[in-house]
Design a protein with these regions (language model features):
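N-terminal secretory signal peptides that target proteins for export/translocation
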Residues: 1-5
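Sec-dependent N-terminal signal peptides
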Residues: 7-17
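Tryptophan-anchored aromatic micro-motifs
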Residues: 22-44, 71, 75, 118-131
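Short hydrophobic/aromatic-rich beta-strand segments that constitute the beta-sheet cores
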Residues: 31, 55-60, 80-84, 95-99, ...
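N-terminal glycine/threonine-rich, aromatic-flanked beta-hairpin/loop signature
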Residues: 37-79
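Secreted/processed peptides and extracellular or luminal domains of membrane proteins
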Residues: 63, 79, 94, 125-127
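C-terminal partner/receptor-binding element of secreted or periplasmic proteins
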Residues: 97-131
């Protein structure tokens, strides 16, 4: 399953670079490790879209292998548990997806949320949803 990088680059290039302590909820959670060659040289990437309708999708690139998932999420105390078992939580002001520190950006507009929902719909159509 391949999602064109041009659809994901807006998430990566135009997001604020600082993580702010705020309650976790709908928005984009991401981590990117760039290689020495710049923009197209992505070594590791994790992008998770958590939608307000209890749906989520994620795309990861680790060791040049792509993976994706889509499904439902649940709030569990002060964390969010994705249907694939991954937990988003905040510790000492930093947001984590499992053990990986990530940036969290709440949706700034309805247009941004709708764009993320479209990306999730495409990922869901190309992967088996987790339950």
């Amino acid at each position: 399953m391949t999602i064109p990088m041009k659809k994901l680059l807006p998430f990566l290039l135009f997001a604020p670079l600082c993580a702010q302590a705020q309650p976790l909820g709908a928005g984009t959670y991401k981590y990117v490790e760039w290689g020495v060659h710049g923009g197209a040289d992505i070594r590791k990437m994790l992008v998770i879209e958590v939608l307000p309708n209890s749906q989520y999708c994620l795309l990861s690139i680790m060791d040049y292998k792509e993976d994706s998932a889509a499904g439902r999420w649940q709030r569990s105390g002060n964390s969010i548990r994705l249907g694939n078992g991954l937990r988003l939580q905040q510790r000492n002001g930093q947001v984590y997806a499992g053990q990986q520190a990530v940036q969290y950006e709440p949706y700034a507009s309805k247009d941004r949320e709708d764009y993320a929902a479209g990306v999730c719909k495409e990922i869901e159509g190309n992967s088996t949803p987790s339950r």
